[in-house]
Amino acid sequence: MTTSDGIKVVLSGENCRDWNGIHYREGMSRKNVGATKLSMNVATIPPGGVAFAHVHVDFELMLYILEGRVRHEYGDGLTEVVENKAGDFIFIGAGVPHEVFNMSETDPVVAVVARSDADEWQNIVPYEGRVQRHAADTSSRGE
């Protein structure tokens, strides 16, 4: 990281972190730039990867898909579905349960992730409330 009179820069190639099936390049947060309300990084979901069901407690999240196709199952019981591709923006409200699937078995999903929480990881909790589905409902996920 470099600093100059109020502007802080995180250089590409600096630290990485894996969490819940997703690879994150270090971005900006409270821990490295002193942000007080925001954090941002780049996330990669490997081919066929899943970020298992979780909830962002008390913060919102925005995604911009750079590469790939992604499916979110969300809401109570994870019964709602939305699919997105490169060029799409996605907003996830605070407290919305969701699970994320890379729809490709050969290509990664790469997205810019921005959060209204400077602490990044501390306010994310697992979600256990998936509604059981019928086989026909899960065939597109390879279950």
Placement of each model-derived feature along the sequence:
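A short beta-strand-loop-beta hairpin characteristic of the jelly-roll/cupin
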Residues: V50, F59-A86
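A short, N-terminal "cap"/entry segment at the start of jelly-roll beta-barrel domains
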Residues: M1-K37, F52, P126-E143
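Hydrophobic beta-strand core residues of beta-sandwich domains
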Residues: N32, I45, N84, I90-I92
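Short strand-connecting beta-turns/loops that link adjacent beta-strands
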Residues: N32-V33, D58, G77, E105-D107
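Ligand-binding loop in jelly-roll beta-barrel domains
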Residues: K85-A86, A94-W121
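Conserved short histidine dyad/triad with adjacent acidic residue
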Residues: E26, N41-V57
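Residue-level recognition of conserved beta-strand positions in structured domain cores
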Residues: V42, V55, Y74-D76, N102, ...
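Short beta-strand His + acidic residue motifs that chelate non-heme Fe in jelly-roll/DSBH
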Residues: F52-H54, H72-E73, V81, I92, ...
